[in-house]
């Protein structure tokens, strides 16, 4: 009898854990929808924009917020990671690299499951800069089934374009003003002088 009772208890515990896990699995997208994504997702999204060895040219060193040199464990160096909530479920992450032409914008949605299939591939983004009224249309692939991020879209700002105030992003026919700051050119020499 004792063994049977233990088995029943184990089965009950397993069922309870499965129920709790299931509730969290389905509730989590709604929680993120209202609270915004957890901080670790920014780092992961920023890291996944790396596309070559030039990301590593600062050898894992970057200036932190207070201007001190910071040894980073990750290979990818970003001076800045800023998140901007455009509307519920739609976020813009700015990843700034080690020079002004390494600014990436990551537009991603975190809608609950019913709306998570949105694919930015079908959208045309118009990016309007403050200098020379630059108007760049871009399309890019996205990953609509990624559970933690929903669909997301990477945009690298064109290198000649120095943006120092706002750009206008048009998506789904709706214009969204985005504040973008240029990053100072932080080359390896500059880091060496400071160090």
Model-derived features: positions:
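N-terminal Sec-pathway targeting helices
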Residues: 2-23
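Extended, compositionally biased low-complexity polar/Lys-Gly-rich tracts
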Residues: 13, 29-41, 157-160, 167, ...
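N-terminal export/targeting and maturation segments
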Residues: 25-99
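Short, surface-exposed binding/anchoring microloops in extracellular/periplasmic proteins
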Residues: 83-122
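Short, solvent-exposed, Trp/other aromatic-anchored flexible loops in extracytoplasmic proteins
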Residues: 112-123, 128-181
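Short, low-complexity, Pro/Ser/Thr/Gly-rich segments in the mature regions of secreted, periplasmic
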Residues: 175-195
